[in-house]
C-alpha cells in the first residue's frame, strides 16, 4: 500500500489493516467472519463494482459452500448494520455491488 497506509476508509467506516478490525463512527464493528470478508473486499475498492461471483470467490475461496446467493444474504445483513451510518452498499442489478459514502 502506498505510503505505509495501514487503514482503509469509506465515510465513517474505517478498516484497520493491522488488526483487521472495522470501526464505524469510532465504535468497533464486530462481524461474523464471512460478513467481515465481504466488507473487507468492498472497502478495499470503495466506489468500484465487485460482482457477486468475485465476492463469492474471495469470501469462500475453494469452499464448496460458495454460492452467489449466500453473498446476497451477507450483503443484506451488512446493510442493516450500516443503516443510518452514511455508508452504504449499492446494488447494480446483474452486475454486483459497491461501497460508497453518502455525500
What is each stretch, according to the model?
Residues 1-11:
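Basic, amphipathic DNA-recognition helix from helix-turn-helix-like DNA-binding domains
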Residues 3-5, 83-86:
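Short glycine/proline-enriched coil/turn segments at helix->beta-strand junctions
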Residues 9-11, 18, 25:
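Short strand-coil-strand connectors
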Residues 12-14, 88:
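Short, surface-exposed charged micro-motifs
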Residues 14-15, 29:
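Short, isolated positions in well-ordered beta-strands
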Residues 21, 26-85, 91, 95:
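Positively charged, aromatic-enriched patches within helix-turn-helix-type DNA-binding elements
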Residues 98-103:
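C-terminal edge and immediately downstream basic/flexible tail or linker adjoining helix-turn-helix-like DNA-binding
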